[in-house]
UniProtKB/Swiss-Prot annotation:
Disulfide bonds: none
PTM comment text: The C-terminal 8 residues of ATG8 are removed by ATG4 to expose Gly-116 at the C-terminus. This Gly-116 forms then a thioester bond with the 'Cys-550' of ATG7 (E1-like activating enzyme) before being transferred to the 'Cys-244' of ATG3 (the specific E2 conjugating enzyme), in order to be finally amidated with phosphatidylethanolamine. This lipid modification anchors ATG8 to membranes and can be reversed by ATG4, releasing soluble ATG8.
Residues the record marks as site: Cleavage: G116, G117
Membrane topology according to the record: Lipid-anchor
Protein name: Autophagy-related protein 8
Species per Swiss-Prot/TrEMBL record: Kluyveromyces marxianus (strain DMKU3-1042 / BCC 29191 / NBRC 104275) (Yeast)
Subcellular location per the Swiss-Prot or TrEMBL entry: Cytoplasmic vesicle, Cvt vesicle membrane; Cytoplasmic vesicle, Autophagosome membrane; Vacuole membrane
Gene: ATG8
């Protein structure tokens, strides 16, 4: 899925912003979170996050769920590079292995597991 954030801002601007963020907030990770293509979950009110490195993927999902006011009975899945990251993985580890060339970690969310299952996200 093509990121709307990437479409809106040129690479140089995104890279400069992520470098500034990482320099200013050493223990934070710059994350762009956008709704996946055909999801019926509402759009999120903001897509840029500064996430603590010691936050787990499961805790990040909780934050996203709260931001979009998703009822408990509705499922939500998040994807990094079209793969489900392990719930217990630290965001710092996911960032280390999967950050974009511009320095941001791109995460998409959906109401369906559209990519079929968890993959080897931490093996590289």
């Amino acid at each position: 899925m093509k990121s709307a954030f990437k479409s809106e801002f040129p690479f140089e601007k995104r890279k400069a912003e992520s470098e500034r963020i990482v320099q200013k907030f050493h223990n934070r990770i710059p994350v762009i979170c956008e709704r996946g293509g055909k999801s019926d979950i509402p759009d999120i009110d903001k897509r840029k996050y500064l996430v603590p490195g010691d936050l787990t993927v499961g805790q990040f999902v909780y934050v996203i769920r709260k931001r979009i006011k998703l009822p408990a009975e509705k499922a939500i899945f998040i994807f990094v590079n079209d793969t489900l990251p392990p719930t217990a993985a630290l965001m710092s580890s996911i960032y280390q292995h999967h950050k974009d060339k511009d320095g941001f970690l791109y995460v998409s969310y959906s109401s369906e597991n559209t990519f079929g299952g968890a993959g080897p996200l931490l093996e590289k």
